[in-house]
């Protein structure tokens, strides 16, 4: 598809974005650059999405990022995105550069208890799964 085939309002919006001095392009992971699949550990990114993010990250004054509810280490291992693409995990509390907010032991314990309770509910309902994030 060429730019001329895009609706006029989309072309105007793109022209406006292209004039900003610094651009952040951020995308969700699951259901956006990777398909929703029945086994979350197999949600690999689509090649076209990786190529687009890599190209965007290579542009001057442009940062490309992927944000996910997944833990940062899981997002990095599963996505295998190039280092030029910034990764942000745990709904924004973990970054691959700059800083990371560690989850304290009380919060980890609470998360374990919540996961256990939800897993019991899921076990009683066919087709329901719980993914620890």
Give residue ranges: language-model regions:
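Active-site phosphate-binding/coordination module
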Residues: 44-133
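Non-catalytic pre-domain segments flanking phosphatase-related domains
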Residues: 1-29, 33-37
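Metal-dependent phosphoesterase signature
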Residues: 21-22, 28-45, 100-109
């Amino acid at each position: 598809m060429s730019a001329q085939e895009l609706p006029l309002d989309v072309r105007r919006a793109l022209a406006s974005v292209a004039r900003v001095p610094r651009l952040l392009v951020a995308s969700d992971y699951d259901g956006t650059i990777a398909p929703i699949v029945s086994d979350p550990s197999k949600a690999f990114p689509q090649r076209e999405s990786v190529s687009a993010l890599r190209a965007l990250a290579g542009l001057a004054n442009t940062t490309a990022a992927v944000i996910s509810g997944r833990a940062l280490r899981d997002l990095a291992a599963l996505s295998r995105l190039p280092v030029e693409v910034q990764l942000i995990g745990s709904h924004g509390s973990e970054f691959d550069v700059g800083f990371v907010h560690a989850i304290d032991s009380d919060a980890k314990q609470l998360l374990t208890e919540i996961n256990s309770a939800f897993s019991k509910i899921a076990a009683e309902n066919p087709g329901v799964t719980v993914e620890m994030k």
